[in-house]
Amino acid sequence: MQATKTHVRKGETVMVIAGKDKNKTGTVMQFLPKKDGIIVEGLNMVKRHVKARGNEPGGIKEKEASIHISNVMPYCAKCAKPVRVRLKVLENGDKQRLCAKCGNSLEK
């Protein structure tokens, strides 16, 4: 199976462009290639009924659910809006990810 190519990376700030958390930003915590999804910190919260285990009490807990990658875009702090990604090849052969509008680097 081929690796999924995506426009967002783990640790990057993204903005949700569709769904119940539209226009909210957060950091990508995990990438799920089989589901083409990501888990964003503090967004798409769902309630789970958890059974007590050992010394951990049971109850209703909130956790992040996955969001499809088509519903998020990288967030540029300089533009203060979601942007498309442009790749620039440097002299040494490395690729740098840039904001397509302002040219600001999207690297961590």
Swiss-Prot record:
It holds the Pfam family ribosomal_L24. GO terms for biological process: translation. Keywords: Ribonucleoprotein, Ribosomal protein, RNA-binding, rRNA-binding. It comes from the Bacteria. InterPro entries: KOW, Rib_uL2_dom2, Ribosomal_uL24, Ribosomal_uL24_KOW, Translation_prot_SH3-like_sf. One of its GO terms (molecular function) is rRNA binding. GO terms for cellular component: ribonucleoprotein complex; ribosome. One of two assembly initiator proteins, it binds directly to the 5'-end of the 23S rRNA, where it nucleates assembly of the 50S subunit. Part of the 50S ribosomal subunit. HAMAP family: Ribosomal_uL24_B (MF_01326_B). Belongs to the universal ribosomal protein uL24 family. This is Large ribosomal subunit protein uL24. It comes from Pelobacter propionicus (strain DSM 2379 / NBRC 103807 / OttBd1). The lineage of its organism: Bacteria, Pseudomonadati, Thermodesulfobacteriota, Desulfuromonadia, Desulfuromonadales.
